[in-house]
Amino acid sequence: MIKDTRLDPDELLRKIQKEEQKEISGRLKVFFGMVAGVGKTYAMLNAARGLKKEGVDVVVGYIETHGRKETEELLKGLEILPRKKIEHREIEFEEMDIDSILRRKPEVVLVDEFAHTNIPGSRHVKRYQDVIEILNHSINVFTTLNVQHLESQVESVEKNNFCKN
């Protein structure tokens, strides 16, 4: 009797999809801290500068310096993409310009404040949704996140998963 050595079609499809997923998804690196002001953005910018020295194409999609001189210094030498201006209630705000990032298509884009709520009129309600769109275009994203933003989601996760500690 001859042994069938062909791959199972379903297994073959899973392998192909897994390989395609590797090729089409960017990678996410999160700089995580307990509270605002502990140096997440500073650390992210230092990491980005290191990558740039290694020849990696790194751009700034959105950074909030909060007026900190040390943080502003680390921006020097990095390409900063323009922000999108959005008017809301007769006041002009600036948000990250997703389209300029997608057109520029860097290897890595820096996106501060992952949990930020965008101004009404933006493409997405939350910045994390902006990040997902960027990742889906095979662009790697460095971002920052505070523990308090995760803590604020505990009740929602418990409710949606029918569990509670």
Which functions belong to the PLM regions below?
Residues G50, E64-K69, A115-H116, V141, ...:
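Conserved nucleotide-binding/hydrolysis micro-motifs of P-loop NTPases
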Residues D10-I24, F31:
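Pre-Walker A adenine-sensing motif
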Residues T143-N165:
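Internal gly/pro-rich beta-alpha loop/helix module
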